[in-house]
Amino acid sequence: MNGGVSRRALIGSTLALSAVANGAEAQPLKRKLKIVVAGGHPGDPEYACGGTVARYTQSGHDVTLLYLNKGEGGCPHRSGQECGAIRTAEAQKACRILKAKPAFAGEIDGQSIVDPAAYGKFRKVLEGLAPDVLFTHWPIDAHPDHRAISNLAYDAWLHMAAKPAFYYFEVSDGEDTQMFAPTDYVNISSTESLKREACYAHASQAPDHFYPLQRQVTAFRGIQSGYSQAEAYIRYVKSPGGLLP
């Protein structure tokens, strides 16, 4: 383990101890919630939050996986249109596994636009979904589409009259997501198998390579938080809390 990972582990472990001391194991949610997980591409919400999504839907809550684009650039030797169709079908399959709903924001893979018009368009999409809880990418990320939807989601949150709880997630930690020091953890020990199945629904995206790496992350987050497997989040400091499963 290199020095950078060790520092992140130390920071995360300190926060985890604080979270456990303050009762990190969530209490049952008493009302039906609407949850939106906003990711850059098909597969991002599943890899980041699949276990958390399964816990929500198993408890009867409504979850929408909102993809910024259809992943048109993710299939070597295929056209963008063909790849987008393949990955849309994979996203729909993953959502069926997690009992979530798919939605697409209409941008193009690798060509994300973040300007006043894009902010307004995304805000309308999010307001139409009216989430009680919003998850999106941590903005310090190597992928421009991840940074784009993070900024779009944050701007929408700032302008929403009824502000949802707002959490950032991690993907491909150390490769895409950078400098991620969690504030909250969700125990996914009972739902990791569903997360795995949903991630493997994205068959065009080499899950045999990427899922074992992601499972190392959730195992590490489990060590930090006292669970077998956990997904980690950063709650925006001005966000409501208490709505994690």
Question: How should each PLM-predicted stretch be described?
Answer:
Residues 7-8, 87, 146:
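Short, cationic motifs built from Arg/Lys/His that form the positively charged side of catalytic pockets
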Residues 1-17:
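N-terminal secretory signal peptides and thylakoid transit peptides that target proteins
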Residues 11-13, 26-129, 158-159:
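Active-site rim/loop-helix segments in enzyme catalytic domains that contact anionic ligands
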